[in-house]
Every structure is written in structure tokens, then in C-alpha cells.
Amino acid sequence: MLDDLGMTTNDYNTGQTIFYLTFLFAELPSQLISKWVGPDRWIPVQMISWSLIAACQAFIQNKSGFFATRAMLGLLEGGFIPDTILFLSFWYKSKELPIRLSYFWVTYEATAIISAFLAFGFLHIRQSDGTGGWRYLFALEGLITGLIGIVAAFWMPPSPTQTAGRFRGKNGWFNEHEEKIMVNRVLRDDPSKGSMHNRQAVTPRLLWQALKDYDMWLIYLLGLTWMIPNTPATSYISLELKSLGFSTFNTNLLTIPAYIIFIVNLLVWTWVSERFNQRLLLGVGAELWALILLIALETISEDASAWVRWVLLIMLIGMPYVHAIIVAITSRNAGSVRTRTVATAVYNMMVQASNIVGNNVSTSGVLACSRYHN
């Protein structure tokens, strides 16, 4: 793609930064809209909207088009994760939320594995006029997302007590007794969830009260820092593997083990966090995992095999992902619906800020995560 668009690695970095900046600024407004109209309405709108832009990436001709589509994608995708967390909080207790969120991120990484196989196939396609196969990949991914968004628009219920509908069945998914059980179990776990209904807007006064809740600030700080160690490797693994001498086709397949390790770590560490009622110490363990691998990448011989670097990079990308655990802490410690609405968005804004920092570690086409001596 870089060659087709006449771009350098620095241009790609700029595009990533644009995406995360617009994503960051869209987080809180998107969450406030979701709280106002309901996540069951807003999430499908987001998905359909960004799927159109994602598909339009198939037609970009230069880096200006790349920058424009990255900006639009950031604006439309921003807030999707907090919106999803808000929606899930209607259904699950605080101790049930982490593992459900881990399933959410498992599906995200599973799509990365599927995309790697698709990329392997599509990148073999190149028209006689020089059209790259990556264009077909973007078009297909946008189409799939759009179809899922359309299904979600008719399938997502507003709450456990509002599952009846034309496409969900006139009697809904649960009987009245089951609905009472579902609502009572959630409210007994966190009575504050009964303070606002699912289509009640957060007023400016409530927004300010949530923002100045200093008990949440340390969690925001965690969001700003904990992902930086492996962000460069995660974002630029394909470019890095190509710089190590692997072909474009093999590069896509060689990223798959990282996603598999990631999924295993995500599920295991999230389960352990609830099994032993421990969360932040697991986060420390994840950082130690990254530190050991970063030291290895720093001290490895310059003439080391490309396969050795590949193993270290894959293990770094697959580091224990405690995002689901920390997000659940944010929701659990919120203490009110307004704070939960705002805090999940602010936490994710900090995560996007950390992505901006991490993505700009690489500045010259050779990733600092693999060749620190540069």
C-alpha cells in the first residue's frame, strides 16, 4: 500500500496519529450521545457509518486521501468501546463484566487472524493496471462491517426488559419472571445502576461532577501508560517483518501467532483476575512481561537471525492484555451511572493518547521496538 500511494513509514505514522487523535476527541461526545439515544441505537449507526468510510479506502489514490479516511474513521469509531461497555453494564454484574469484555476483545483479535488470511489471498491479486489487492481487502472488510451493523440495528434490544420487537419476536427473549430476576441481580450488585434510565442524557452539571471525581484519576493514568511498551510492535509488525526480509505474503501469515498468543493470554489472565480477586498485580505482571522482551530486543546482537527477532516481537505483541480487567475496574468503581458513562469514555481517551505516544516511537522506518540502537 505504501508504494501504491507514494507514502513513507513516516506518512503512515502520521495517518495513525490522525486516526487516534480524532478517535480520542470523538470518545466522550459519542458516549454522551449513546447515553442520550441509547447504545442499542447509536452503536449500529456508528458501525454502518465507519463501514462506508472503510470501504471507501479502496479508492484512495494518495496520502491525502489516506489521511482523510483515517480522520473520518477515527471520528466514527471513537466511543464504540465505551458505548459497548455501557450496553453490557445493563445486563451483567460487576464480576461478570471482565470475562464478557475479554470475549469482546477475543472477537476483535479473531478478526485480525481472519484478516491476515484474507490479506494473504487478496495481496496476490493485482490487476494489469497495477491496482493493489489491498483495495479489495478494504472493500470487503467495509462490506462485512456494514452488514453486521445493519443486523445490529434490528437485533440489539434496549435493555433486558425491552427485548420484544418485530425482528426479536413479539414476546421478547424472556418472560416477566426472568426479566425481574435479571434486573434485580444487576441492581443488587450495584444499586447505582437504577439512578438513570438507558435513554437519559448526562447534563453538563452531571458531566462536570463525573469529570471531577478524583477517585477515578489514577485509573485514567493507567490507561495512559500501560499499553505503550508494545504499541509500536503491535501497530507496525507488518512493516517491521518486511524490513527483516520476509515477503509481503509471508508477513501476513507470520502475524497470526501473535494474535493467538494474545487471545490465550487475554482469556487466562481475565479468568485469573476474577478467580483470585486480584487485578492490578496482574497488570504489573503484564508490564514485567513486556520489559523482559524489550530488554532482549535492546541487547540482541545486530546480526541475530530474523527469526529470533520475529519470536521476540510476537511474544511482545502477545503480552497479557489486561485492558478488559482495567475497563471493568473503571465500570465497577464508578459509583453512579453518570460517572460510569463518562469514566469509561475518559479512560479510553487515555488509551488512545497512549497509542499516539506509542505509534510515534517509530520515526524513521526502522522500528525502535526492534532496533533500539537506531
Regions found by a protein language model. Give the residues of each.
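Extracellular/lumenal inter-transmembrane loop segments of multi-pass membrane transporters
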Residues: 1-12, 55-67, 74-78, 89-99, ...
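Central mid-sequence intracellular linker of multi-pass
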Residues: 94-108, 128-206, 374
